Design a protein with these regions (language model features):
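Conserved beta-strand in the GNAT
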Residues: 56, 62-71
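Active-site rim helix/loop that mediates acceptor-substrate recognition in acyltransferases
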Residues: 21, 32-54, 60, 115
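A short beta-loop-alpha structural element at the N-terminal edge
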Residues: 2-16
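Conserved GNAT-fold acetyl-CoA-binding loop/helix
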Residues: 23-42, 79-93, 97
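Conserved catalytic-core motifs of GNAT/GCN5-like acyltransferases
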Residues: 74, 164-166, 179-199
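Conserved active-site alpha-helix within GNAT-family acetyltransferase domains
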Residues: 125, 130, 141, 145-146, ...
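Conserved acyl-donor/pantetheine-binding loop and adjacent beta-alpha core of acyl/acetyltransferases
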Residues: 74-131
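Conserved GNAT acetyl-CoA-binding A-motif
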Residues: 126-128, 155-168
Length: 204
């Protein structure tokens, strides 16, 4: 396997990795009628705005993981709201009716109009953030640590004072992994059984 900088030709493959890890780290293909719904929320803006902070993991079968970074989270989310979402709002219908009956893709389409990915002022001391996903065949082999280390080196070179990330409260494996990488819990958001834990660490 090889860690290399993201290239524009990797766009579709990174979206596919997001889909194959979109159920708290497990494959979510069976859950979604729109295979791009997850990537539109969690991947595309990073590739568009800060491709220099994106790396992919590749083996003989193709791209099997990625790590994405944003140097200044406040600025990133401002651009996310101002530049990324409006074109998607033009090409997707806002879900209506009983929210409890929406399928997973509809729930994500709703986030195009009522975004949850917004700047968290409580994380101001850790201004950068990252997002990493590896599909099953790439997990448990140490590649996740290497990819995060690569991105952290970039953030340190750019004088970042700290970095944070969000992880599902249901993803115990990922939480343990991030703790081993030096991340500590800062805050929680949403319901206890299906919310987000924000973890952070200082740099360097």
């Amino acid at each position: 396997m090889l860690i290399r900088p993201y290239q524009p030709s990797d766009w579709d493959a990174t979206y596919q990795v997001c889909l194959e890890t979109g159920d708290s780290g497990l494959d979510a293909k069976h859950l979604h009628t729109d295979p791009k719904a997850l990537g539109n929320i969690y991947v595309g803006a990073y590739l568009r705005f800060e491709p220099e902070l994106a790396y992919v993991l590749e083996d003989e079968q193709g791209v099997c993981g990625y790590v994405l970074g944003a140097l200044d989270s406040k600025r990133f989310y401002e651009r996310y709201l101002r530049e990324w979402l409006p074109p998607l709002q033009q090409t997707h219908a806002k879900p209506t009716g009983d929210r409890s009956k929406w399928n997973p893709s509809a729930q994500l389409h709703a986030l195009l109009f009522e975004p949850e990915m917004v700047y968290q002022p409580k994380l101001v001391n850790w201004p950068a953030h990252l997002h990493i996903d590896l599909i099953a065949r790439a997990q448990g082999k140490g590649w996740g640590k290497q990819m995060i280390d690569r991105l952290l080196a970039d953030l340190i070179e750019r004088k970042s004072s700290g970095v944070h990330l969000g992880v599902s409260t249901r993803n115990d494996r990922a939480i343990g992994f991030y703790q081993k990488m030096g991340f500590a819990e800062i805050m929680r958001d949403g319901p206890a059984d299906d919310g987000t834990i924000y973890m952070a660490r200082g740099l360097p």
